[in-house]
Amino acid sequence: WAINGVQLVSFIKSLPEGLDTIVFPEGKQLSSSNIQKILLARSIIHKPRILFYEDPTDKMDNDVSNEIIDFITAKEHLWTIIVSSKNPYWKDKSNRIITMQNGKIVLDSKI
């Protein structure tokens, strides 16, 4: 479900050994967007209670990024997400937004 949710299925099917393909250190043979997808899948596979992300989809195109954000923020998932991102779509999916400037909270709003 995690691999499907972060849209890695077709990429994994294209690998010579599928999930058993050996990846070089730091994933140097992978695109930056696929690296982010792998990291996202790994972060959710064990269904944690809390997720911390920093620009988790910034290397993906907007449509794919938004679809993955929709999946990560779906109501069926019972985790709390704390995210720092420049992508405004995260705001649409949030119930609380904290804005910081120069290390200080300048806005704390519940939606």
What are these regions, as identified by a protein language model?
Residues 45-49:
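A short, proline-enriched helix->beta-strand linker immediately N-terminal to the Walker B motif
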Residues 1-22:
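Conserved "ABC signature" C-loop
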Residues 58-71:
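Conserved D-loop/post-Walker B switch-helix segment of ABC ATPase nucleotide-binding domains
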Residues 93-110:
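H-loop (His-switch) and adjacent beta-strand-loop-beta switch element
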Residues 40:
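Hydrophobic anchor residue at the start of the ABC signature
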Residues 51-55:
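Catalytic Walker B motif of ABC-type/P-loop ATPase nucleotide-binding domains
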Residues 71-85, 91-92:
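Conserved catalytic loops of ABC-family nucleotide-binding domains
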